[in-house]
């Protein structure tokens, strides 16, 4: 069976503990910590068929369900310049970003970027790749199913300078997003009752009916 050990502080000794969100044979993974180091964020399938997100109090081991997931596994995480985990992404259909607290600094940054470009997390994938140590500047990418994306530098203006966003480079500039087809998620119930998820893509040229090519894969589970 899996055994867990915990240090409640940097100077504390390791202690053997039991986590109430773990069942024998289940899946559990440490994702990261909040900025203060008082909460650990854990993915566990204790109550759901795919891992959901829980916070664990580092002193009391009290657990709180932060996000219940029933469809897709975790596809990524978002951390700040100070190493704090503030977001987790899932892709049940489109990419979905789940913020781990209402006062998340990551959430404020992402809302700024969504508003600036007039997009949301349903059709556009915004990913922060790096920060400066003071958190004032960050590099992010903006992409979608039709656009390979571009790299930008965001100066947040925390040092008194004027906030700005500048283009750094474009990925695969030879591709014209206007000529790319949209990926549309769909799902249906199979004869055995299992819900199957997929995407369909229709050509941007020609006339219907088009020939069908089926590519089978294992997502999003």
For the regions a language model picked out, list residue spans one by one.
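Beta-propeller fold detector
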Residues: 15-19, 64-70, 164-170
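Non-catalytic accessory segments flanking enzyme active sites
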Residues: 97-205
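Short glycine/acidic-enriched loop and turn motifs that connect beta-strands
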Residues: 46-49, 92-95, 144-147
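Conserved beta-propeller blade repeats
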Residues: 1-4, 13-43, 51-53, 71-88, ...
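Hydrophobic beta-strand positions in blades of beta-propellers and related beta-sheet-rich domains
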Residues: 3-6, 31, 53-55, 85, ...
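Short loop/turn segments that connect beta-strands within beta-propeller blades
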Residues: 8-10, 57-61, 157-159
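Short beta-strand element of the alpha/beta-hydrolase
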Residues: 208-218
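A detector of repeated loop/turn-to-beta-strand junctions in beta-rich toroidal repeat architectures
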Residues: 50-52, 148, 210
């Amino acid at each position: 069976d899996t055994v867990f050990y915990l240090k409640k502080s940097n100077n504390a000794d390791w202690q053997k503990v039991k986590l109430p969100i773990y069942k024998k044979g289940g899946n559990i993974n440490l994702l990261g910590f909040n900025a203060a180091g008082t909460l650990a964020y854990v993915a566990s399938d204790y109550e759901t068929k795919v891992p959901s997100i829980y916070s664990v109090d580092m002193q009391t081991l009290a657990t709180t369900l932060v996000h219940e997931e029933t469809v897709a596994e975790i596809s990524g995480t978002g951390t700040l310049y100070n190493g704090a985990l503030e977001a987790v992404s899932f892709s049940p259909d489109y990419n979905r970003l789940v913020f781990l607290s209402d006062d998340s600094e990551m959430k404020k940054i992402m809302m700024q970027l969504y508003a600036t470009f007039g997009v949301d997390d349903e059709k556009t994938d915004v990913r922060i790749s790096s920060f400066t140590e003071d958190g004032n500047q960050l590099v992010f990418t903006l992409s979608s199913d039709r656009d390979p994306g571009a790299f930008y530098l965001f100066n947040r203006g925390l040092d008194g300078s004027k906030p700005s966003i500048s283009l750094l480079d474009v990925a695969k500039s030879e591709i014209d997003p206007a000529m790319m087809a949209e990926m549309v998620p769909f799902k249906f119930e199979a004869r055995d009752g299992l819900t199957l998820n997929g995407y369909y893509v229709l050509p941007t040229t020609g006339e219907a009916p088009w020939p069908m090519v089926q590519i089978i894969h294992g997502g999003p589970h």
